[in-house]
């Protein structure tokens, strides 16, 4: 562990107002110190490194020029907000980032008045900013609203919907396009290509060359002034105008996002111009700027674990089992080797979802559509129409963004699209914005859709094979973040019978019915209950929909207590089981049914096991639910023979 960086100027900054009297040279020094502080802090906590390093100068310049928090700065996604937090009175807590009870890794309204809008998902900043701009204008407040959005986020349609609206409304809104040429995976699609062309367009280069020839003939003082003016005017003359101008934005840029002497004058000019209508400032930055390991491998330093500042080497605990993501990726490649119709679709997350393995093995059969979940789902529906077998791999929380497409374009038409839902359940340090806790509730209500939930990595392998062979309609498989439980994965996984669960452990009196990875907690609860003379039956539902009615009826008939356990929100598996048991009259005989699910509230960042404990779905909570149902004290034992056999 290295000593903390020396930051004499940063030590004097208590908030953004302290930056407003600084010179450009002092702002440059402050940026260097903020960068050093951020690197040191993230080396301790882990988190999103590359994005924040790329916007240090921009962050300092924004808080120097604008009157925050009265003026609003909205950070799209929020990955890049660490320098912002350091400058806005949270430096003393910056080494608690993403820790339980510590600072959020994203902007959070409850955390600071300098966070006017919460973030976590991409492409929301312009819409929120436009709403704030119009709301402020209606209230008679003359404040500035700045939305900072990355080039990767500009691949989502929502950003253009907002820009189209802003241009038509002629509202005063400042959008800063942070063009670092790098989202988590290289940005894809027409937008990124357009930005690259903008920087090197023939029309611009020819004009610039002519201007340089003229400027070279001027006296030295005029030449220097003209060169500076030329730097600030880049991009404003591009022949036929720009896409942004067509949307009604006044375009400024591109400018160097690491030159304080470029940023400050441009931001100040835009602020003081008082122009009606939206403005877009195109700022070019480098992801990972100022830290060589992150500059050289920006994809590896987007999100990091704890690391050595000097070497850049990240701490990696030796895995006890392969991750669920890795298992999915490996099994999908194996299935694709046997069936040329299998293709993969991801929304800018090939590495995060394991589809990078498919892209390596079969590059023509893997499609990264950018941050565009709605498009990804309907694109997959089109692939299915042509006889292909698309696997759409998305994080659970991001699938929410394409829900209408799931309903209207896939499920309603019974198209055989396969949804691989990663990060299902609690996700730990990424907190509420990334928690995958709602998918069972919003998918379980859809006709025609099969939903599988993996209890361990071996089950996941079987579910990939099951999905690959399911051609009669859409099917989803959900699995959590992190490592598996260490069970052996079959070399040749066999498909599961649709809608059939399994008994994992036979017992009597009490039945624990788990879906997904809560199975391990149920088995742990059995060990605790054994000390009290109880031997519960443990079952794995496997399928949310259709669930195994025969299995549920059997458990209800043979036990006095049935505990349903899920790592999902209210309205999920437990609700389906309770409704079915009620309608079948299987609760009329006195069966004690309890449903353990995530309570009706959001859970902020913490270790997943802590989140589960707080939610009341861990082994201890299951044990308590059993004892409460039997009306036993937690220290009591029971005569097992008295329970229903």
From Swiss-Prot:
It is an enzyme of class 2 (transferase). Thiamine diphosphate binds at residues 79, 120-122, 152-153, 180, 291, 373. InterPro entries: Dxylulose-5-P_synthase, THDP-binding, Transketo_C/PFOR_II, Transketolase-like_Pyr-bd, Transketolase_BS, Transketolase_C, Transketolase_CS. Its EC number is 2.2.1.7. Mg(2+) binds at residues 151, 180. Its cofactor is Mg(2+); thiamine diphosphate. Binds 1 Mg(2+) ion per subunit. Binds 1 thiamine pyrophosphate per subunit. This is 1-deoxy-D-xylulose-5-phosphate synthase 1. It comes from Rhodospirillum rubrum (strain ATCC 11170 / ATH 1.1.1 / DSM 467 / LMG 4362 / NCIMB 8255 / S1).
């Amino acid at each position: 562990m290295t000593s903390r960086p020396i930051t004499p100027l940063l030590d004097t900054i208590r908030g953004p107002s302290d930056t407003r009297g600084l010179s450009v040279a002092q702002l440059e020094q402050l940026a260097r110190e903020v960068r050093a502080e951020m690197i040191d802090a993230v080396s301790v906590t882990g988190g999103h490194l590359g994005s924040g390093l790329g916007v240090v100068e921009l962050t300092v310049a924004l808080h120097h020029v604008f009157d925050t928090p009265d003026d609003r700065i909205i950070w799209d996604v929020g990955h890049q907000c660490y320098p912002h937090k350091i400058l806005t009175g949270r430096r003393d807590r910056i080494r608690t980032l993403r820790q339980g009870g510590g600072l959020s890794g994203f902007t959070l309204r409850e955390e600071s008045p300098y966070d006017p809008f919460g973030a976590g998902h991409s492409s929301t900043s312009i819409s929120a900013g436009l709403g704030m701009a119009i709301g402020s204008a209606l209230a008679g407040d003359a404040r500035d609203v700045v939305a900072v959005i990355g080039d990767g986020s500009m691949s989502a349609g929502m950003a253009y919907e907002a820009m189209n609206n802003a241009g038509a409304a002629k509202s005063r809104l400042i959008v800063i396009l942070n063009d670092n040429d790098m989202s988590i995976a290289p940005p894809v699609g027409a937008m990124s290509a357009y930005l690259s062309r903008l920087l090197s367009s023939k029309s611009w280069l020819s004009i610039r060359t002519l201007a340089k020839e003229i400027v070279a003939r001027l006296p030295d003082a005029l030449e220097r002034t003209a060169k500076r003016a030329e730097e600030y005017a880049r991009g404003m003359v591009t022949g036929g105008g720009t896409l942004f101008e067509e949307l009604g934005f006044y375009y400024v840029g591109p400018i160097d996002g690491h030159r304080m002497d470029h940023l400050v004058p441009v931001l100040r000019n835009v602020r003081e111009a008082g122009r009606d209508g939206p403005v877009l400032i195109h700022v070019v930055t480098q992801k990972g700027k100022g830290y060589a390991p992150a500059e050289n491998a920006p994809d590896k330093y987007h999100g990091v674990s704890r690391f050595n500042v000097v070497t850049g080497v990240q701490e990696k605990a030796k895995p006890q089992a392969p991750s669920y993501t890795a298992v999915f990726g490996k099994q999908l490649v194996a299935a694709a080797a046997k069936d040329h119709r299998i293709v993969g679709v991801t929304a800018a997350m090939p590495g995060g979802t394991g589809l990078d393995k498919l892209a390596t093995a079969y590059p023509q059969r893997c499609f990264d559509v950018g941050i565009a979940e709605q498009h990804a789902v309907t694109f997959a529906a089109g692939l299915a129409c042509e006889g292909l077998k698309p696997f759409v791999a998305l994080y659970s929380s991001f699938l929410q963004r394409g829900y209408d497409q799931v309903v209207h374009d896939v499920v309603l038409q019974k198209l055989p699209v396969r949804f691989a839902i990663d990060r299902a359940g609690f996700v730990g340090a990424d907190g509420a914005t990334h928690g995958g806790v709602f998918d069972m509730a919003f998918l379980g209500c859809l006709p025609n859709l099969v939903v599988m939930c993996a209890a361990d990595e071996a089950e996941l392998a079987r579910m990939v094979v099951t999905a690959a062979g399911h051609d009669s309609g859409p099917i989803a498989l959900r699995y959590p973040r992190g490592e598996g439980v260490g069970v052996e994965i079959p070399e040749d996984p066999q498909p599961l019978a649709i809608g059939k669960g399994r008994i994992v452990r036979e017992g009597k009196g009490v039945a624990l019915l788990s879906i997904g990875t809560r199975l391990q907690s149920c088995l742990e609860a059995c060990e605790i209950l054994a000390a009290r003379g109880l031997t519960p039956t443990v079952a794995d539902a496997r399928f949310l929909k259709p669930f195994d009615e025969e299995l549920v009826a059997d458990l209800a008939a043979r036990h006095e207590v049935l505990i349903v356990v899920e790592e999902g929100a209210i309205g999920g598996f437990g609700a389906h089981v309770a409704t079915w048991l009620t309608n079948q009259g299987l609760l009329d005989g006195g069966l004690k049914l309890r449903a353990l699910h995530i309570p009706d509230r959001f859970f902020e960042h913490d270790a997943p096991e802590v989140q589960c404990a707080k939610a009341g779905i861990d082994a201890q909570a299951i044990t308590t639910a059993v004892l409460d149902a039997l009306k036993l004290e937690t220290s009591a034992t029971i005569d097992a023979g008295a329970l229903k056999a």
